[in-house]
Regions:
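Anion-binding catalytic surfaces of enzymes that hydrolyze or transfer phosphate/sulfate esters
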Residues: 1-70
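Feature marks hydrolase-like catalytic cores characterized by long aromatic- and Gly/Pro-rich stretches
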Residues: 39-177
């Protein structure tokens, strides 16, 4: 009943989506997808990137507070991620410089069942290092974390047998309590 009549206008930020997500999680839904409708793709004008990231982090804080107020934070896992990363260096010398696509990215995972920490790592050139999937710690000679290892780890974290979806993939376990 809490989401009947709720209208989410495009570009109105995360607040209406957070309200709807919490209402759905209080009901019968077991997942929700939130999209801030922001352009994080800053090939140029790098100054915009910080503004958009601050908006995103404020939204994450708002989501955490709303989940906590609804007594859902202890049973909810939050995953914030992108399909790609950005180069660690600017693509030019002007005020309009930005960052191009980069094969390494990061994810923020928090909430129920998550062991706090930093998992994975980069070398001196900022390329992804291999990791031990059991611990999430960098390990020489190991393969870098792949998307399927991460997805299998998230499934494992939320209590789903990852082998049903990724039968030949080892999930990352390091961030799981």
């Amino acid at each position: 009943d809490a989401i009947v009549g709720l209208k989410m206008a495009s570009g109105s930020g995360l607040t209406p989506q957070i309200t709807a997500a919490v209402a759905m999680l209080q009901g019968t839904s077991c997942s929700a997808y939130l999209d801030p409708h922001l352009d994080f793709d800053t090939h140029d004008t790098i100054a915009d990137q910080g503004v958009h990231q601050n908006t995103l982090f404020a939204g994450i804080s708002e989501l955490i507070a709303a989940l906590e107020a609804a007594s859902l934070l202890g049973t909810t896992t939050i995953v914030v991620m992108s399909e790609m990363g950005r180069t660690p260096k600017l693509n030019g010398n002007t005020n309009n410089a930005g960052k191009d696509h980069w094969p390494y990215t990061s994810a923020l995972v928090l909430g129920a069942g998550v062991k706090p920490g930093v998992y994975g790592g980069t070398d001196d050139q900022l390329y992804g290092r291999g990791i031990d999937l059991a611990t999430g710690k960098p390990q020489d000679g190991a393969l870098p974390l792949a998307y399927d290892n991460f997805a299998a780890g998230i499934l494992t974290l939320i209590g789903i047998d990852s082998k049903e979806w990724y039968p030949n993939v080892t999930p990352i376990q390091g961030f799981i309590v």
